[in-house]
Design a protein with these regions (language model features):
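Nucleotide-activated sugar donor-binding and catalytic core shared by glycosyltransferases
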Residues: 1-175
Length: 175
């Protein structure tokens, strides 16, 4: 309170917390909240990707940077394969943000022999892929906010680079 002249919040519900503690506060909003709105586009997104209304859809979002994809996509794809054992009709949408990401994900799918009909579908629309999903498995980042705003359940995963893990494991001890 003593160190803050004015707290700027992203969402209207946040202001009450600061007001309770006597902190000057103003909600400035967030561009994603303004652009995505709160309308549910699940059916429209499924139609766009030629998916059925009753299909079970999981969207996999291992990140948008090459290093993230390299670390997380194999883990996410392994989890997808395990999920197919119990739920063989699952379909997986994998959005990509660039031609390089598309090529990288395609190479991983080929490496893991995961070109099975229409089960693993690459799309160039992350908001549509989130909207179409029953569940989103994603890396920590902006996509978590997008998924929250689009009101989809999510599992957030992250895998540190080896050097970061080595440094962090020396600094942080978890009992």
């Amino acid at each position: 309170k003593r160190a803050v002249d004015l707290m700027l919040t992203l969402f209207p519900f946040e202001t009450a917390v600061y007001e309770q503690h006597g902190v000057a506060v103003k909600c400035v909003g967030h561009p994603l909240a303004d652009s995505l709105g709160f309308e549910d586009h699940k059916l429209r997104s499924r139609q766009k990707f030629e998916l059925g209304e009753d299909d079970s859809i999981v969207t996999l979002m291992p990140g948008s940077r090459g290093g993230e994809i390299k670390r997380l996509a194999p883990v996410f794809l392994d989890a997808a394969v395990e999920s197919l054992i119990d739920c063989p009709n699952l379909k997986f949408l994998i959005p990509y943000s660039s031609a390089a990401n598309h090529a990288q994900i395609n190479a991983l799918l080929r490496e893991k022999s995961l070109f099975r009909g229409d089960q693993f579908i690459l799309v160039d629309d992350s908001h549509g892929a989130i909207s179409a999903a029953d569940l989103v498995v994603l890396s920590s980042g902006t996509a978590t906010l997008e998924t929250l705003l689009l009101r989809r359940p999510m599992i957030v995963g992250y895998k540190l680079a080896a050097i970061t893990f080595a440094i962090a494991s020396r600094l942080v001890k978890i009992p």
